[in-house]
Amino acid sequence: MSAFQNGGIASRALDDDSDIEEEALANDYKEQVQYEGMEELEQVNSMSMAQQTDDIQSRLAAAAQPLDFSAPLEVKFASYDNYCSLFHFILNSDGPVDLEPPSYYWAWDVIDEFIYQFNSFCSYRNRVARQGTNEEEIQILREAPNTWGCYSVLNVLYSLIQRSQINEQLAAMKRNEEPMAVAGDYGSKSLYRMLGYFSIIGLLRVHCLLGDFSLALKTLDDIELNKKAMFARVMAAHFTTYYYVGFSYMMMRRYADAIRMFSHILIYVSRTKNFQKNAQYDSISKKNDQMYALIAICVAFHPTRLDDTIHTALREKYGDQLLKLQRGGPESLPIFEELFRSACPKFISPTPPDFDNPELNVDPLEHHLSIFMDEVKTNMWSPTVKSYLRLYTTMDVKKLAGFLEVEPEKLRGWLLVNKQRSRQIRWTDNGLLDGEVVNSNDLDYAMQGDLIHISEAKVGRKLVDWYLRNLARTY
């Protein structure tokens, strides 16, 4: 197997970017992940111990190196083969590989680059299929449907998690027990433990890219999102985790939880920008606009108080746009679409495209955008209706319909949908999917025949907390 191709590329920016099933994935990993060069891998046993160690160390270091986005197709294929070879060696050797990771962040770099190349290849393949103009590349891609396949990538991640027993270790730590007692021969090794841990973050990312947002959050059941978590030691992993958790919450209409996630990471970045002056931080800071765009969307759906730092930055970046989002109506639609396009991840399709019928291939981004915009249109008139309802304690449906110039029955249906939308699940404890149903609006109403009963519960601002918070910042 040839060495991993990296083309001498410098660090790239961050991309714009079941237990039974896990056991089955681990068992059939060897026969499902196919690649050329197996004979060469088997010859490693005949090498001297020094040569073998040097070769593996070089492959470990190479696996974390970024691949040029514009690399030719054969280089992308070779990169996939090299990853398969490396992961096969790590997972299927006779016993655990006795090697230490080159650095504490190496495992994250490997998983991050592995998923980045998978994401880039899928987007590239889908684009070639939709255009249908390059016959040579189409033929090459048609003959290799399993290269950078969704199943293979998920198989690697699940296998690393299962082999390292990382979920069992994290669960033991939650119970204040010794994780090494359940780690086993593989999980006790730093190489497997770190790869398994960051594979969980990788699964969050991949499931989100595939559009399965609930499964994305489910993968983090054993990871506690706090400053003591292992991912918080690596800035890029920290940022990525909160971005994808927040985005998954947003797509599940849990806007309060999404705002909490986005706020955490944006405040963290703003407070550490003077202490982290490196290429990694620079690449992350360039994605801040995406984070602010997403939080602007969430605040439009779920008006709430924000941290003063975020609120100020949001007004500076999206002043006029933010006002239009909050007013709703047809003029807000293009702004929602623009912000979503600029801030969403690069979605991918779980299956190879149809090269014979290019017109049948749907852009995954357009698919998720249409779902999102349907939700926007459902809530489009919410600010306008609320502005009328706030003026009354009781109101006739026909009267409100006259103000809005719509049919009473159409308005009745909208009011029922809007009331259902105002009930959100908000996280309280345990897993990220858990929580309790709360009323997300300060305005509530009930319908009795044609009569609307309105109640408003507005919590006054706690001035003491505000003064204490700002005094702490000043001094």
Swiss-Prot record:
- Domain of life, per the record? Eukaryota
Q: What are the protein's UniProt keywords?
A: Cytoplasm, Initiation factor, Protein biosynthesis
The terms describing its cellular component in GO are: eukaryotic 43S preinitiation complex; eukaryotic 48S preinitiation complex; eukaryotic translation initiation factor 3 complex
Report the subcellular localization: Cytoplasm
GO molecular function annotation: translation initiation factor activity
- Where in the numbering of this chain does the PCI domain appear? 257-451
Q: What biological-process terms (Gene Ontology) are attached?
A: formation of cytoplasmic translation initiation complex
Family the entry assigns: Belongs to the eIF-3 subunit L family.
HAMAP family associated with the record:
eIF3l (MF_03011)
Assembly and oligomerization: Component of the eukaryotic translation initiation factor 3 (eIF-3) complex.
**Biological function:** Component of the eukaryotic translation initiation factor 3 (eIF-3) complex, which is involved in protein synthesis of a specialized repertoire of mRNAs and, together with other initiation factors, stimulates binding of mRNA and methionyl-tRNAi to the 40S ribosome. The eIF-3 complex specifically targets and initiates translation of a subset of mRNAs involved in cell proliferation.
What name has this protein been given in UniProt? Eukaryotic translation initiation factor 3 subunit L
UniProt source species: Botryotinia fuckeliana (strain B05.10)
